[in-house]
Design a protein with these regions (language model features):
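Sec-dependent bacterial lipoprotein signal peptides
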Residues: 1-14
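Cross-family detector of peptidyl-prolyl cis-trans isomerase
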Residues: 3, 16-231
Length: 231
């Protein structure tokens, strides 16, 4: 496990006494490297496991280093840590599943209400769109590369990506994007501007990019202007 490997490294690098961490001045290059590695590994441990009891954490280091006053043998320690992280993983998975379910329901409710509004058209896939401005050029195909401006938001208005805000259009292949975009772009002519309301199953579904504003099963809204069919 990641946590256990980090602890193993720490046990080799960190020197503690029973009153806390020993304070030593940095005198040599090796001192600096040792201290820097200790800082880096400690940050990684905190990022992986931030709710530990600091005193017992240090006590565990100290006991393992000098092999005295051991409260848990190695097998028991591994069993405890493994069980704890399995439980945390299950709790996190359950939380993500609940959030994904709530996002799905919120998106479906939004789209059900949105489809009844003036100007909203719905395709067989569930993609909804409004024509903000019709174009006069050609329509792209799945073989096309296009240049577009876009502004993407969640259904609550949160902006997650925008070439408009960046002030620079972007280019990509029609099939190199989410399914809702691939379908929607082929409805447009060069020069057109549409607003797309995209169900989660033709957006990023249950597996959006990690760490982003788009969460699992989120419905998305895009203002898209098709500037040019590049090829």
């Amino acid at each position: 496990m990641k946590y256990l490997s980090l602890v193993a490294v720490l046990l080799l690098l960190v020197s503690c006494n029973k009153n806390g961490v020993a304070q030593k001045p940095i005198k040599t290059e090796l001192d600096s490297v040792s201290y820097a590695i200790g800082m880096d590994v400690a940050k990684n441990v905190k990022a992986s496991f931030d709710d530990f009891d600091n005193d017992l954490f240090i006590q565990g280091f100290t006991n393992a280093l000098d092999s005295t006053d051991i409260l848990l043998d190695e097998a028991e320690a591994q069993k405890v840590v493994r069980a704890y992280f399995q439980k945390k993983q299950q709790e996190e998975m359950a939380k993500r599943q609940e959030e994904a379910k709530a996002n799905k329901e919120a998106g479906e409710k939004f789209l059900a209400e949105n489809k009844t509004k003036d100007g909203v058209q719905t395709t067989e896939s569930g993609l909804q769109y409004i024509v903000l401005k019709e174009g006069t050029g050609e329509k792209p195909t799945t073989a096309s590369k296009v240049k577009v401006h876009y502004h993407g938001t969640l259904i609550d208005g949160t902006v997650f990506d925008s070439s408009v805000d960046r002030g620079e259009p972007t280019e990509f292949g029609v099939t190199q994007v989410i399914k809702g975009w691939t379908e929607g772009l082929q409805l447009m002519k060069e020069g057109a501007k549409y607003k797309f309301f995209i169900p989660s199953d033709i957006a990023y579904g249950a597996n959006p990019r990690p760490g982003g504003k788009i969460k699992a099963n989120a419905a998305l809204i895009f203002d898209v202007e098709l500037l040019e069919i590049v090829k």
